[in-house]
């Protein structure tokens, strides 16, 4: 301990905050028993005649009737519980692995990139947080590459059908039982649609409610879950299938604009399939229950709208441009999102601290005082932060005051699979399960960012101690993780 008692002071502050948190959180429970005791004492003082007169009165009958009707209305109108039976993440074949050296060799052989562009990609790749075993489609491994419609369809079929085959095998669900289908893929939207491709492959029923979301970026996986959840509130006793993926074949950039070269270094093959149910009996065999979804859209701001933008360069080569303001815009979107999410998940102790700090800052016009960032670790146990890149994970770790353990799943997913777009949050959840860390009652926060600009959150609660499903994408390599990442 130093002369000023620094460690002791910090430890004391932590204990005081913890005590405050428990006092405020359980305040109403602590007050309930004394109030009930007073109520029973008052009732015991009433005479038998008083009670008989009260029970025989019209008012008593009215109150009882009102209570019964109110209870019926409440139970009929409350939202249906949405359960996650299981999910599956696609594991590409080993032949599609791409090391740093192979990436750079292939890029130099293509002869579309200048020496400056090759060096830029090399530096981005080294600093990206990606490992040596991420995957690219066969069309990009080819020299020259094959960015054809047929190759793009082939990639989509491999990823989507691979994830779905494993999901149906693990759940033993007949595909014709599915009543809702939501597919999201931002940059590849053929005709017929990807959702129609799934209906055709698995012979889904003719009255299925089918949706195909395009152009919505890396946060579209949460949007798809939210849409499926809304549909399950309307349609009783059915399943919803959510498929999230991205397609690289026709979206590889072959130009020399630096802002458009970054996605080449980050995005990799991946996809997920999630099976949801609103059937009460499915609770027993489900892994998770959906607690909240919160969606934030900053598209009304021009800078936010343009920060992730598909366009053509001066040579008419198409790619996705990433703005230098991306992280600042993501930070603003995050603040807006957690402002809405906080009251739904945070203990009242944190809400009071946040509100008091906000009011004090406004009253005293103290612009230098930083806003109070709620401690989400008090309400959430696991964090699945979209593995968009090292900078994204770093920013959220800093903003939310998370520990390296809290962002481990995100960093390791980025290292092992790269940025798989909207499906990355499911690879992260699979990592947590493979590590044996998911216990009954644990709460999981999935948070993703996407073009538009959007920040979307989903919160789940584990219904049991969750074991990894068969063919979990980490099952053959989890013993090697976490790995040390040199940045």
Swiss-Prot record:
It catalyses: a very-long-chain acyl-CoA + malonyl-CoA + H(+) = a very-long-chain 3-oxoacyl-CoA + CO2 + CoA. InterPro entries: 3-ktacl-CoA_syn (IPR012392), ACP_syn_III_C (IPR013747), FAE1_typ3_polyketide_synth (IPR013601), Thiolase-like (IPR016039). Inhibited by K3 herbicides such as alachlor, allidochlor, anilofos, cafenstrole, fentrazamide and flufenacet. Strongly inhibited by metazachlor. Induction: Repressed by herbicides such as flufenacet and benfuresate. It is found in: Membrane. GO terms for biological process: fatty acid biosynthetic process. Gene3D superfamilies: 3.40.47.10. It comes from the Eukaryota. The active site is at 218, 297, 382, 386, 415, 419. Its EC number is 2.3.1.199. The chain crosses the membrane at residues 23-43, 57-77. GO terms for molecular function: fatty acid elongase activity. Residues 74-363 form the FAE domain. GO terms for cellular component: membrane. CDD domains: CHS_like (cd00831). Keywords: Acyltransferase, Membrane, NAD, NADP, Transferase, Transmembrane, Transmembrane helix. Expressed in flowers. Pfam families: ACP_syn_III_C, FAE1_CUT1_RppA. Pathway: Lipid metabolism; fatty acid biosynthesis. It is a multi-pass membrane protein. Active on saturated acyl-CoAs up to C22. Mediates the synthesis of VLCFAs from 20 to 26 carbons in length (e.g. C20:1, C20, C24, C26). Belongs to the thiolase-like superfamily. Chalcone/stilbene synthases family. This is 3-ketoacyl-CoA synthase 17. It comes from Arabidopsis thaliana.
